[in-house]
Amino acid sequence: NLKDLLIEPDTAFIKKLKAGETDKKMGIELSIPTFRLAGLNLYKAITDNKINISKILFKDATCKLLMGKKPKKIVKHNDDKEFNIDSIYMKGLDGISIGKIEFLRNKFEIYDLVNDQLIVNNKDLKFELKDFFLEELKGNNDYFRLHLENLKLELLKEEFMVPGGNYNLNFERIYFSMADSILEIDGLLLKTTYNDKYELAKKLKFTSEIYDIAVEKIKISAFDLEGMIKNGIYIIDSVAVKGLHLDILMDKRLPFNTDKRPKLPNQSLKQMRSPLYISKISIEDSHLKYQEKYEGYEEPMTAILADLNAQIHFATSVKDSISTGKSMTVNLQSNFMEKPPLHVNFIFPLDSRADTFYFEGHLASAKMNEFNKASEPAIGVKFIKGDLKEIKFSGSANPEISKGSMTMLYSGLEAEVDKKNTEKDKNIFLCWVANTVVHASNPGKNNKL
């Protein structure tokens, strides 16, 4: 056993790190009150030069990463000295095997020295690493290969403060198995640190998304971890998301950031720096609620996709994959406003300079007043009565233009149009709705659209 192990940089190094006067990007403070080795056979270690440890325990330890200013000078290190899991130099040993490394009640922090603030903090970090060992390379004395084929990792019930201090990230369990090529995340939560989301909105300069996210389970299968580590290439067969509950709020009373141009999914993929290939992403049994708060309306505009399922295929930034001409596809099924079934299909060509994507969809029958939570705050239209028979739509869009067609069949429509809000009077869609509701039915008496 080792007690009260402390590793920390001196004040002179911290001062230089903060000012960017060192070639290092960060420093480490490490405090380990309890460090314990179990199952170590000293006799075998001495006679055979092999170390076998059944368990290593780190208890109540604190690891703090100190982030400084970007270094003014970058020192290029010799490639021969870089760490390589296939060739690790350790003189005087014939092998090391570790059954389990356990971290119990530990703390992890990232501290920004420049802005004097804590940007990442967890409360009770506990996890296990299992089944890995070092094997001496044949014909290369004192050089070893780190075997991770049977590595397992499990983390339980962690909470982190996300950089910026506006969100907390929690999860019930993270499990990773190298042999099975599986990463599972259970009970993931991303919640604002404010009980009232509008209090967070007051801190924002421009209108921006405020999230609440809960996910029952995420499972990532059949991925090449070695390729990720060695070459920075992310190849994944499938990502399965179950029980996603995504709430998004935007306070439209704040100004829009005209310098911010959100990218389309196909644009974002093609502009990724790291090569990514995901064969399939599936979302099941999920729920999306999107809200916008407008001036003059007590309740926010609310759009809901309930019982949401989606399938995404061929999400890639790999140039060789893009050059095949194959498109990324998204197929979505849900109940709009928790009532009528909605089906939407997207096609995102990746090998295209115009970045145009295509869509088509269908909304089934419903009572028109079921859409009031969306229509009244957003476009100033309140449906009194009427029956929607169906809506069919299709079109295409890119960052510059969009075009398409929509057919809406309805009967017995009666609605009120709010013309008090001058901004909404300028809305082209509002003008279309105002003209539409003059007609009580579509098709009309002569069965003409």
Feature roles, as predicted:
Residues 345-350, 355, 362, 373-449:
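Extended terminal
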Residues 6-9, 60-62, 107, 189-192, ...:
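Transmembrane beta-strands of outer-membrane beta-barrel pores
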Residues 71-78, 202, 254-261, 378-379, ...:
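Flexible, surface-exposed loop regions and adjacent strand-edge segments
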Residues 14-38, 50-53, 116-130, 161-173, ...:
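Amphipathic hydrophobic-ligand
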